[in-house]
């Protein structure tokens, strides 16, 4: 690890997010969704999927964090030492978001993966769709606050900070890189649901992957060690 260049360390963030994308699809593809069908319970569609999918998603969410942590440390060091952004408010917002992501990304996979397992158990025990969805929503209420806060702090803060730093030319990246953030890419992902429900899974993580890819390729040289 010590022999790795700064670019290689930052690229570990892309590896981490690639693992997260796989976990996202295991969690979201063909499971829960929204519908206009008047017969659907609370406008929710739900399907039983194998428990192993959620177990593997949790493992991937947990396993990707060490790689992401290494990438975060290196990227923040580059921004502080090479680009002198330590005192910038936008950078501080960016730093908070990335530090928060180390915990939040593991939580989102482990915490949310419990919900479809509860649904599966409900369907197995009762065979009643409405009752099973109700049980799932009850469990969801216990994690909705930290989930919402994590989303705001991580995805919200990093998007605002990234767009601000790019617009102010604080980083040597082109304006086209503005879109390389989790919120914009997640919004693009919503369009995928018109093709198939759940196809938007992984687009938030893809936004993070693109952000780290841009930073790895543009902020440091190939063999540079900051």
Tell what function each PLM region has.
Residues 1-226:
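Hydrophobic, aromatic-enriched alpha-helical segments typical of multi-pass transmembrane helices
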């Amino acid at each position: 690890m010590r022999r790795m260049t700064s670019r290689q360390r930052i690229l570990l963030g892309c590896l981490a997010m690639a693992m997260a994308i796989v976990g996202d699809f295991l969690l979201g593809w063909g499971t829960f969704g929204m519908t206009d069908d008047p017969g659907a319970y609370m406008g929710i569609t739900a399907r039983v999927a194998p428990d192993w999918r959620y177990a593997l998603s949790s493992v991937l969410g947990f396993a990707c964090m060490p790689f992401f942590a290494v990438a975060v440390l290196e990227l923040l060091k580059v921004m502080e030492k090479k680009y002198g952004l330590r005192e910038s408010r936008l950078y501080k917002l960016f730093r908070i978001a990335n530090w928060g992501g180390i915990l939040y990304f593991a939580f989102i996979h482990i915490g949310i993966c419990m919900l479809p397992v509860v649904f599966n158990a409900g369907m197995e025990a009762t065979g009643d769709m409405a009752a099973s969805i109700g049980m799932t929503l009850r469990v969801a209420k216990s994690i909705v606050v930290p989930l919402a806060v994590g989303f705001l702090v991580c995805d919200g803060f990093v998007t605002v900070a990234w767009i601000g730093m790019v617009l102010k030319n604080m980083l040597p990246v082109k304006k086209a890189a503005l879109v390389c953030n989790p919120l914009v890419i997640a919004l693009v992902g919503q369009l995928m649901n018109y093709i198939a429900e759940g196809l938007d899974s992984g687009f938030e993580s893809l936004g993070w992957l693109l952000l780290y890819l841009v930073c790895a390729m543009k902020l440091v040289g190939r063999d540079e060690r900051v």
